[in-house]
Amino acid sequence: MHFKQSKVLVIFLLILPLILNYSLPTKAASAQTSPALYVGVDVAFESIVETEQLIDNISSYTNFFVIGCTGNYNEDRLTTISQYAYDKGLTFIVYTDLPRYPSKQWLEDAHNNWGDSFLGIYFYDEPGGIQLDQSDYPFVTKADNYSDASNKYVSSLNWWLRSGPDAITKSFGTSKYQLFTSDYSLYWYDYEAGYDTVFAEFAQNYSRQLNIDLCRGAATVQDKDWGVMITNKYDESPYMEARIDLYSDMVLAYDNGAKYIIVFDSDKKWTQNVLTKDHQDAMKQFWEYAQSHPRGISAVSDRSAYVLPKDYAYGFRAPTEDRIWGLWNNDSLTLSVSMSMAALFQIFGNNLDIVYPNELRTVESIGYQNVIYWNDTRILSNLQPIQSPSPIQGLSGEQPTLLALIQQLSYMLFYAIVAVIITAVTVVTIVLKLEKAPAKK
């Protein structure tokens, strides 16, 4: 290689990190997550015949099944469907919201009859969402502050999962059984309460990536598993999203590392299935995609973490219009935290986890490429106030909206990259001119 070319290459290599890296502390490590994949359907309607027909239809392109109880705690029905799923080569779990269903005897028989194909119990649905919306039977209705709410939520839910005399795990005859749930908020605290796996819900028009980042982050820091539950988009027929959207959601979950990808199947009254042939075709198409695009082991060091304030359980369904623990309205931190998250989405894309401080295991020890705390002023220090076309909840029109913030960040990143490229070209040009200049005698 000529000397001139060597100099150009060296200069380019020196400048390249300026283009690729965001100037935050690096925390490199080799922590990794499992590439295993479970794909299936969560059936929440009653009919045994229709359930078996669905299993027949999907068993060639799924490997996982969720058996709902639909309010009818019938162990004979449960045994029949479990055996049918097992005979079709599916792994499966069972939903319940009663600590004594299935019975201890049924669970012992399940281990003997189906071995590792029966993975565990999906106990209680959406505990975090119920808390956030204060719907039927929330775990906390009154608290002195955020930390008090956190302690009460975790201890109350854990009482039903593991520590209380009637806890569901007291019926487990083997430590191999896992505890599952599906939720749309407070994933971090679901894990703290004792769940082994939480499915982040893809529902309505809420941000898929945001829920992935919150659930995956909680699972990663607490060394648990996570997945996605694609549930109803509408409150009435056709209930589920279109085929193309279902396929896209499954691919998104897969590409982000979800271990479980599940499609919910039931109408609002839990009386009949809602998945059409189009939906089943989308699942088959995804199965083929997963077979032709095998995942490697995803290193945590490829991702960055944004650390929220301790016990700041905001719902994040809107930049400033959700609630904290279901007990308080937004506060002075809400807007700045939402803006910081929007900025980091723009910078890191799907390589961002959103987490909380962990007393047992520091976030820095996990192995993230970058760890950014909520009060790191560098995130927003260069943003200027811009006029909002529609001020939110009486906030000043000078406050940036989430959309405007993203647009502004796009311009900033564009101009920064252009500036770096111009600098690189200038430096290379000067070096080349110096090479051509006659040497002084």
Q: What positions do the PLM features span?
A:
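Glycan-processing catalytic domains of CAZymes
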Residues: A29-Q393
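Secretory targeting signatures
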Residues: M1-T33, I58, L395, Q399-K441
